[in-house]
Amino acid sequence: MVLRERLSHILFHEKVGFLLLCLLWYISSAVTNTTSKSIFNELRCPVTLTFLQFGFVAFFSAVCLLFRKQFLGGTGIQKPSKYVLYTTLPLSIFQIGGHVFGSLATTKIPVSTVHTVKALSPLFTVLAYRFMFRHVYSAMTYFSLVPLTFGVTLACSFELSADIVGLLYALISTCIFVSQNIFGSKIFMEAKSHSTHTKKHYNKLNLLLYSSGVAFIVMIPVWLYQEGFAYLPEVGSPVFLNLIYNGLSHFFQNILAFTLLSIISPVAYSIASLIKRIFVIVVSIIWFQQATNFTQGSGIFLTAIGLWLYDRSKKGNLYESCKVKEFEKDALELEEQTMEDEKSYPSSGTQSPFYGKNFLPQITPRLDSVVPLISDSPMTPNSVYSNEGVTSSVSGNATPASVRQSTQNDFSNSNIHDRRSSYTFQLNNFKAPQPSRLWATETVPTLKI
């Protein structure tokens, strides 16, 4: 037991374990991409490879869960809930589209070029949030997109004359994965709001099993229509062995990504993902002995600089968003407390028209701090808070035909908190008392908003 705890401490809490997990993640990702390119050099089957990748991940996840339950006494395959199916089904569509177009791009252009184009995902993310959701980014974020875009353009300048279709496939794949990240978060939030708040949790292997399994099932008709059994390699052939290696490495790549994301922060994970992309580009260039000129090398270097600057800007934005969330949380608690105080305030039997408007009746606000904040409001400095009985008509809505509430004439400082504004409801007309002077609230405490 002590040895197991020590091993767990080394693997998940110390820098050595973190670096080891990152290195394994990088290697598995590089093996997946290089074996994919090797398979496409022998047999162009992008749909079949994507289909088998989902199947391998689901199969190996199920095997690991059964082995864990049988020999280690851990959690086995859990029954899927509506929440899991609701979230994995739409996301599987994005997964299928992104992987298929990525495989199509790999069949036509080098792996390094595909991943260089995929490095444009921050650019598409910022543009989507800016124009679709009106999100405002910092100047540092926009500045980081300049070397990123310029670097990708330089790195792909040679491929523009070679195969423009492959670059187009890579761009489509990048846009699909960006859409998955944007709408996937909204799908998760909507699913949580409609969930039954069950306490059932799913481990990483179960999540991999259901996400890949749903994508595998959904892709069956697409695979049968596009390629089918004719593109399956013979058992024992080099392509068949590469498919096995590709499926294993793809499974380890996914499980290592889940593990890293669960033990480090999102910002640290994004930096590790940046290094992984650069690692895959360098390994693919060395593995396939790809000729790279000075322009392409400079483009890859500028792309790495742009990604690093973008991650630094995200770290600053994350800090600002945390402060905003803390402020919103405090404001929400204050609003709930205000509503409770209003409901518990003793009433005279007639409900005030300001009930539910977050104005505390025991505090009389200054009009110069309230009226400018109310858009399309009929209230003016000459229409509320007075000790006079003269009234002026203001349009309003009222359910009773005739309701009257008298106002007290004694406005001493001893009963300042018991004052009520006189009002009269007469057939959809709200009449407020006229003040004796322009501002009748100099001695009243200011309402802080």
UniProtKB/Swiss-Prot annotation:
Positions bearing Phosphoserine: S348, S352
GO cellular component, one term: Golgi apparatus
Localization per record: Membrane
Polar residues bias locations: 382-415
Membrane topology of this protein: Multi-pass membrane protein
GO annotation, biological process: phosphoenolpyruvate transmembrane import into Golgi lumen; triose phosphate transmembrane transport
Positions of the UniProt region annotated as Disordered: 382-416
Record carries keyword Phosphoprotein: yes
Family statement: Belongs to the TPT transporter family.
Protein name: Putative transporter C83.11
Record lineage: Eukaryota, Fungi, Dikarya, Ascomycota, Taphrinomycotina
